[in-house]
Amino acid sequence: ENALKLASFQTNKKKVIAFKNGFHGRTSAAVAVTDNSKIIAPINAQQEIELFNLGDLQGVEAALKQQDVCAVIIECIQGVGGLDESKTSFYRGLHLLCKKYEVILIADEVQSGFGRTGDFFAFQKHKITPDIISMAKGMGNGFPVGGILIHSSIKASFGLLGTTFGGNHLACVAGLSVLNAIEEEHLMENVTEMSAYFVKIASTIPQ
């Protein structure tokens, strides 16, 4: 929610581009950019959203040319959607389009972040740099905590965004403990090794 709000503040626009089969949350703007009509209430219809198939750069650029888009939000691996992902060429192309049309690129790493892919964030595999990164879930290893990272080009101001339970000391300790465990227990290296093993074994299973 805060990632989308910040993108709107930064660009002074309100339309968002998202992708079919994606999931970004259950609050106002986040649920509006989620491709699931069952959880979108009529009150969310005020949001200006356009959904595209994952990989459709041509469609995205046609929409960006209208100059009314504040953000493109994407999961580099669609968690709830069934682990769908596109090719590196798509993510790099999307990144370039956002730069070309001065649109904020939001990487939703709530499900894929914190080492779950072998990289700290899933977008790193594609060598792109989002403007905003949203994170949660793995951030606290089960303890409720979330946040966003913003590019230095975005000038946030005190009080611009807020959260009722923000700055919780216990949540911060949980987050630090997770970072320590990832480093000390070499969890990302283990993910990389186990991934190669899994792919090797899975490839022997008949289609």
Residue ranges and their predicted role:
Residues 1-207:
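Conserved N-terminal phosphate-binding loop of PLP-dependent enzymes in the Aspartate aminotransferase
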